[in-house]
Amino acid sequence: MQELIRVVILAIVQGIAEFLPISSSGHLVILGSMLGELGESVTLEIILHAGTLGSILVVFWQRIWALLLKDRRVIGLLVIGTLPAVVIGLTIKTQFPEILRSPLLAGAMLIVTGVMLIVLGRLTPKSGTYDRLGLGAAFLVGCFQAFAILPGISRSGSTILGGRLMGLDRDDSVTFSFLLAIPAILGATVLAIKDLLEDGSSGETSIEVLSIGAAVAFAVGIVALKWLIRWSREDRLHWFAYWCIPAGLLVVLLNLR
């Protein structure tokens, strides 16, 4: 029962923070440092990523279907936009893996996320659409996504800000952000599977508990994603800065003691 409760806690955090601009990686690192080895299971990481990936596929299935049928140029934009995260992600994972588990860095980057959200709230609305985005602009949005490899930097907040700076309107900046998330989450899942195979252990968590975790992450993710879309249309995403900055300051202060 204790393991089930811990998995459900992680699934809820993953489902909320994967989509709302508050950084799932940062919160999981901080939560793991508070509660011990809560977030260290590679198998659980794969399962929770699969749950939130399912949320994206459900919410954006019409856009994804359109990409496969007629908007194939956008697939090229997504490939270009994914390259920075691949290069930087592999570099950090292989050369500096310790920073991905640093609660101090996660706290500091939560503050940066809060500042980015404040900047986002001050931008003048534009009318660009993601299907008209240039290759260079897609690459730059991808650089914003690569920045979010650091724990505490929100992937959604960073890429939505990048899209808005490239001239996208509110809806399309959100849509492009989460279309970019599909290869990013798939890539993270593949790396996690690779680590799992090299480690040779799937952990002690039962299939039933893992299934519940995936279902919780999936359901919470759908709610969080729809919440983000609604608040983006209402220009409220900067409100999350009031969580990120105080939380980040608190984590930094606690880890500097």
Swiss-Prot record:
Record-level Gene Ontology MF annotations: undecaprenyl-diphosphatase activity
Location(s), subcellular: Cell inner membrane
Catalytic activity: di-trans,octa-cis-undecaprenyl diphosphate + H2O = di-trans,octa-cis-undecaprenyl phosphate + phosphate + H(+)
Residues spanning the membrane: 4-24, 41-61, 74-94, 103-123, 133-153, 173-193, 209-229, 236-256
GO biological process, one term: peptidoglycan biosynthetic process
Keyword vocabulary terms for this entry: Antibiotic resistance, Cell inner membrane, Cell membrane, Cell shape, Cell wall biogenesis/degradation, Hydrolase, Membrane, Peptidoglycan synthesis, Transmembrane, Transmembrane helix
E.C. no: 3.6.1.27
GO cellular component, one term: plasma membrane
Cell wall biogenesis/degradation among keywords: yes
Membrane topology: Multi-pass membrane protein
Cited InterPro entries: UppP
Function: Catalyzes the dephosphorylation of undecaprenyl diphosphate (UPP). Confers resistance to bacitracin.
Family note: Belongs to the UppP family.
Additional record remark: Bacitracin is thought to be involved in the inhibition of peptidoglycan synthesis by sequestering undecaprenyl diphosphate, thereby reducing the pool of lipid carrier available.
Entry protein name: Undecaprenyl-diphosphatase
